[in-house]
Amino acid sequence: MVVERTASFGKLHLKGIVASVGLTAGLLVLIFPLPELESPARIQLALTLGALSFWASGVMPAPITGMLYMGLLLITNSSDPLTVFSGWTNEGGSLWLVLCAFLIASGVERSGLARRAALSICASGQVKGFQSLIAAIAVIELLFALIIPSAFARTFVILAVAKEVCKENSVSETDAAVINFACFALAVPTTLIFLTSEPALNTLVVEYSELGLSWVGWFSTIGIPNIIYLFLVTVLFIRVFKPSGKVFVDGVKSRASLEDLGRLSPKEKKMALWLSLMIAFWLLYPFMGIGIAWGTMLLTSLMFLPRIGVLDAKAFADVPVGTL
């Protein structure tokens, strides 16, 4: 009991030290003259140092620290609301896209489509353990990059399938967390492989690349190096993140479970149809004059309609509001 109290006090003491260091650094930025920085920039830097120290120490929950940071930026007039909330208000609508990605992944999981996809992957016989599972995630990321330009959307769909693979094969929480992390880590190298990817459609990227809009030119110059990059990241990930125990993917059990599922259920068919509509929009939105976030938001909203939809109010429980 004494040892536990001592350890708890030690952690609390360390949190206080880290937070104090950050706050002190912020105060020094405000007190000492920095001619290169104007007053708003100095306030922003001081608040950022304080917020980082709070995040690092865990003195407050991360979402509350974020709220405090944004509130102080606005109260001190060191920034304006459009800049502070640009993730919600800018043309790209990145945070709306993240919100929709969570809801789409929830639909894939709740409809049973994720479990069927997971069983199909396990039953193929190609995925037998931790290393082959990580390699499979890399391959799926590569294939999905061709048809789903948004890294957020494809990562969360793949994540839903990866969770089901871990659940079906009784993977430990520690190893499951590593496998889930792989879905995000291996998504990074795939963002610029194909000209259909979201960053590649950015006019500035195309302009500075001096490749025009040639699909083949883009792939040969940027795509192939990024495929090599994906391969190297996959190998590095497998080398760095070792499983805590043996991860065994039971192909025989998965095949039996897949047979028990039978044909696609009505809900799975609906979700497959909605995914097809999403993919069609993601491929065509540059020619439609509609922002990817706003079109995705519209389609995701329609997924809540009765009869034809697959989502309900409970789906919002899968959205980590604190993270947003």
Model feature map: region roles:
Residues 163, 193, 200-220, 227-242:
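Alpha-helical transmembrane segments of multi-pass small-molecule/ion transporters
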Residues 82, 111, 115-119, 156-163, ...:
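Short helix-terminus and kink motifs of transmembrane alpha helices
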Residues 1-97, 220-324:
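Hydrophobic transmembrane alpha-helices of multi-pass small-molecule transporters
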